[in-house]
Amino acid sequence: MVLLQVKRGDELIFLYETSVKEKTDTVLRELVALHNGQLKIQRVCMEIEELAEHGTMVPPEMIGLNEEQREELKLKDVWADKCIPSGGFTINKDPLLRRNGQQPTEAMQKVLAGAMNDAKAMVDRRLAKSSKTLTPKIVEEALNLLRGGVTIVYPMQLPPHDSIRMEFTNTEDLTGTQASKEVIEPSKAQFWFAGHQMLMGKLMSDYLGHNDKTKVVVKLNQIGEGPPGREAVISDPLRRQMMAEAYRRQEELKKLEQDDDDEYLNSSWADSGSLKRQAHGLENVRFRFRK
């Protein structure tokens, strides 16, 4: 199987296994679904943190209004009495005025926290550095963990306008949010290899060759974003090492310019036999003669 190191910009977001015989359309569609799935889980977890602190969301027309304003406008959250967390709640008002302030019990908060931690661990971008691949099944299992945790705490479900429930039913509206800039629209998706766009209607082998045991970097973006930057020819650690070596050499040359004698002949790089001794492992060999 070909191992794709999938990046968004310069960030490695996950590893994905495929075949050189697979169609580019199929691969791109799945890569976009995995990327957007990662983002969905991040968004849901952020909202569940708020749910554990301040309860369910108030209706859209009440968001941002304090109690006096709601009373003045005769607005009431009819879902507050229907969507009560298991074990009851305590009042913890939401400073952002988005949620009803009915905080679940400590035990139920732990249920939500456990589901969040497990789900985030399953799709963590750092897994790519541990050579662990991401699959649609893993993303779906992570979402099911979150659904299960929320259902335990809210057996009567969340209000239909709650952003968590909307995420679960894929009816979320991200218009005007920062999240909307991160999500890739499938119809506008592109992916690139070695500075070249991988076009639809092709096979992966058209770009990667027929070796099914290789590892390559591909980059995701959208129409209008332009070609992503090429991968660096050398890695950052190697680049830093080369710069340090160049600096050391420069300092040594400066020192030689200040010397009036032949001290440079004592330097290892000036010894014509040094490279040969290194190749044969004789660099630090010393001979001791007995009388």
UniProtKB/Swiss-Prot annotation:
Query: What is the organism of origin for this protein?
Result: Drosophila melanogaster
Which superkingdom heads the taxonomic lineage of this protein's source?
A: Eukaryota
Which protein family is it in?
A: Belongs to the CFAP298 family.
Identify the PANTHER family for this entry. Answer: CILIA- AND FLAGELLA-ASSOCIATED PROTEIN 298, PROTEIN C21ORF59
Q: What is this protein called?
A: Cilia- and flagella-associated protein 298
What's an example GO BP annotation here?
A: regulation of cilium movement
One Pfam annotation reads CFAP298
